[in-house]
Amino acid sequence: MEKIILVKPDLSYADEIIKYKEESLKENPLINGAAGLNNFSSIEDWLEELKKRSSQETVPEGLVPSSTFLGVREKDNYIVGMIDIRHYLNEFLKQFGGNIGYSVRKSKRNKGYAKQMLKLALEKCKDLKMKKVLITCDEDNIASEKVILSANAKFEDIRCIDGENIKEK
């Protein structure tokens, strides 16, 4: 398994971010853990949004401060995933989404990258002095459930949101 590091997105990764976005959007119109990347036509605008989201003073209304990272293979700077840490929970995130959202490039799944990314993100949560971290997944997303449980998570419950069951850990 190749070693992954978490890095803050910047313009030096622009081409790789675009490729990641394009590959992800072929599968789903929403890119989990990417802080709304799917809503931006330019990487510059998305990076500006990440700056706004990083601070309580500038976070857009309805959101909470967050830190977004690229999961990058250390040997070649290839983006295998993205992960977003929400610094605390609002009412929406308590029910849907939790503190951490992530995605792994479809072509790089089942290689242990998500486990590495989550482990590294949980270290970042400690740095942020977060005492408890809520991570959710769809009930039928067995791969994500295994990733979450690999981080010594404790199953909390299953919640029905808009007719879909969501597992909380």
What label would you give each PLM region?
Residues I135-E145:
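Conserved beta-strand-loop-alpha-helix junction that forms the acyl-donor binding cleft
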